[in-house]
């Protein structure tokens, strides 16, 4: 059995409890790692791998990082999905008997990191927990440790839908049970979410106040999340707020796939924010406001009174230009109050953080004054509700210097005059050299020795040096010999000894006292955290509403009107993002009118004509309106929409083994199963991923089902011109087309939506724009003429047909067996649109087994 040194035994004992984390083991000024941790960390962090003697026959692998720069290394590991356990020395090495006591003081995980570049200002950093409630429902909770925000909700769907929802919210780490981890594991990597297992739950006696507003079924996720936070952070976190319950009926629900298709927060192309609705709407000037805007985008409102309340504030801000500009000027001076409050509670706040808190709170009276003086009741109500936190400002103004350093260890954080003893120590430390110089001059005058000097070294401290030729001039009764040199003697006096102790200890004692005073101030601030958080919430909402007002003015947006019916009327509507991207080019506006008895629209027209843009435009106007923002239209009279479903331009989900057509069918199934008459449904070219007749049949049957069974406001684009005939059979269906024309043999897209069906597809013209070879285009024109002449078969090939590359699987002459015909009948009876993906797979498996058994 290998015998290690006591220190290494201590390391191994600690490591046993943190097997899934890198253990940063404090040794002096370094955090050291050993064994596998050292090997792996040296590769990931690109630091030198060395070794050390640990009492065994062979040296063990070791690497380390300086404690003062450890944050950067920790952040790198956490960003890559690893966990880091911080093991500190918990006693003074000078007082230790044997091995210095050490213990883990924090476990930093992907969801709990509290500082560094990972915490991007305008984005939340959420950690979540989920629990499977039944076969189709998951309860979940999430919180941002850096701000204290905490939310609980639920979602219907499978494990992939849950993870897509978590990914949409930006959740970095999801706490699950062992069984749920198995269910989610295959999708977690694609979603870039770390799954962490936690079996324990915080007891209700500790957590009751956190979950009062949460339904009992969802509380288990909250309790498990709190237990994990408590276990990893190992400190009181007074800034974590009570969980709010997001009851879905109060919000416009948009599934993660539709959010992606509409490019609300991330663009489909680059995955960044440019070209998204968030990019357009974000004129916020605070980090808090940026995060709040993103939250509102994720969950627009679905309660008319709440929407109209926001719109009323935006209207008043638009009418008060000078108030608006003064408010934004003041808000630009406000730092991230939510995260500053979080750092106070967490205990990692610095002097500069407290200065930022003080300077931010100093802006609140000016903000309040502007709101109260605006002459608008809505703005005055906001102003009255603001807490200026005067007592916090007074404490920080009295205690903290104007420009403190980043870390408390550098000193000069506490203001002079705040504490008498600290002032004395600082005076001694700052003026020690002056006192020494003055004493030296006094001793020269007393003794008459012109070359008498006072010096200092680390061994003997301060001393008075007199050359041997002048010793007879000194009053040796006042001097005590300290050191003898070849040509001089060194002495000390009682006064010098006392001053030496004061000078040498003053700086060290000053820093220690300053740190203790800083901790007292930090702890005193904890009782103000709820007030600062409430203020931050008000300021963040004001920032977003100011952003809505400035954007609405800049882009000539219009105030939407809401009613309790289902009709949707948008006059001269525009796609806000496309319009901005076009810069000075003219954007062609379009109407969209869906009446109560005519609320399905079938859109035809050539590729590149703007069908998809038109459909997205309608959805974005609904989203913006229900966020409480003005919209890009001359007029918008809208119903309250409960859900938006989109099937527009999905990319192949190859990683999940799903083709474009399969994704199309799954998303269509989800929409049809969950939509209500109050929903908005957008379908772009359904059925294009399969054969013409299959696709056309699916598209028609879906339109009929939505028309007859659901009744939702629906936009349905297609290349199947045959479907336009359905206008005669479906009373609520109207045909429209995106106009195009020919000029000099070239297609010109007018981007104008007009009533009626398109009379031409212009597919070959689009191919010409793409500069396909003329030989191909010419042949296509010939084939098109044949098809349009009514030929039912493919035009005769110009070359002799080659034998098929693949033999047919079936011969037409072979009759179908009765048992096979029975399987076909069963297949025909399956309601595909009313079947979940898992049920469909089971049915398919059963039918396949029946066919295979026939051949045995």
Swiss-Prot record:
Record-level Gene Ontology MF annotations: ATP binding; ATP-dependent DNA damage sensor activity; damaged DNA binding; mismatched DNA binding
A Pfam family reported for this protein in Swiss-Prot or TrEMBL: MutS_I
GO biological process: mismatch repair
List of residues binding ATP: 605-612
GO annotations of cellular component type: cytosol
Keyword field: ATP-binding, DNA damage, DNA repair, DNA-binding, Nucleotide-binding
Record-linked InterPro entries: DNA_mismatch_repair_MutS, DNA_mismatch_repair_MutS-lik_N, DNA_mismatch_repair_MutS/MSH, DNA_mismatch_repair_MutS_C, DNA_mismatch_repair_MutS_clamp, DNA_mismatch_repair_MutS_core, DNA_mismatch_repair_MutS_N, DNA_mismatch_repair_MutS_sf
Disulfide bonding pattern of the chain: none
Domain of life: Bacteria
Function: This protein is involved in the repair of mismatches in DNA. It is possible that it carries out the mismatch recognition step. This protein has a weak ATPase activity.
Family: Belongs to the DNA mismatch repair MutS family.
Protein name: DNA mismatch repair protein MutS
Taxonomic lineage: Bacteria, Bacillati, Bacillota, Bacilli, Bacillales
